[in-house]
Amino acid sequence: MTNTFELEHIGINTENAQEAEKLALLLSSIFNLKPRHGQKSEFAGDYFECMKSPFLGKNGHIAMKTPDLESAVEELKKKGLDFNMDTAAYDEEGKLKNIYLAGEFGGFAIHIMRK
């Protein structure tokens, strides 16, 4: 089966909370988006997540969403990709919610999540 993937958001690493807020406000202003505060990050609409401290990926992360996460993981494994199992998050029912691919792609980590 071939799974479908859509861009969920782009996470951008910053040095601290002040830089994250500054960048989120700038991106919100440029693209007419609503800024939003989060615990670990500041957001510019639904598209940009400005991390309050450096996280996975030299530059940040790219989040992709898919309707069938388990099937997508199996498809990507068959393509030779590995996963960072330390990042796997599960819902209350024990189903996988999201996980990062191992390594970086153009300086970005890639986060796969359930749509």
Where are the language model's segments positioned?
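Mid-chain, well-packed structural core segment of small domains
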Residues: 58-88
